[in-house]
Amino acid sequence: MEDRFIAATDREPEVTLHFSKRYISLKGEAYPEDAAAFWGPIINALKNYLTLDAQAGLTLDIELLYFNSSSAKALMNILNALDEAAQQGGDFCINWYCQEEDETMQEFGEEFSESLQYAIFKIETLAI
């Protein structure tokens, strides 16, 4: 799998797909004008990786300051794909980073974590 880096814009997060190191990072704000065009290739790349090497596992770091409902759906698709792969025996860890005073993002992290059964989901608060 080819590693990829997508620089952040004012509406799209920084995305690091470092499959060779079994690592993905999403950082910034996520409310792209065309959510399908932005998230689709990322989700497809992840699913291709999981098809090739799901047993290897992966770490996903999410440090989003804001996301819209379309991005929430894409995030759920990503998390579900990782959870399904974890069910097959891979070691998958999701780290959800949010600022300690951002209760909304903490609650989103809690809601996402409740929908997963097999992947490890950690919520970490960051000091401002």
Where are these regions (language model features)?
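N-terminal amphipathic/basic leader segments beginning at the initiator methionine
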Residues: M1-L17
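Amphipathic alpha-helical interaction surfaces in cytosolic regulatory modules
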Residues: A37, I42, I62-F112
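Helix-adjacent hinge/juxtasegments
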Residues: Y49-T59, L65, S70
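A cross-taxonomic marker for long C-terminal extensions/tails that follow the last structured domain
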Residues: I6, E111-I128
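Secondary-structure boundary motif
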Residues: N48-Q55, E84-Q88, E114
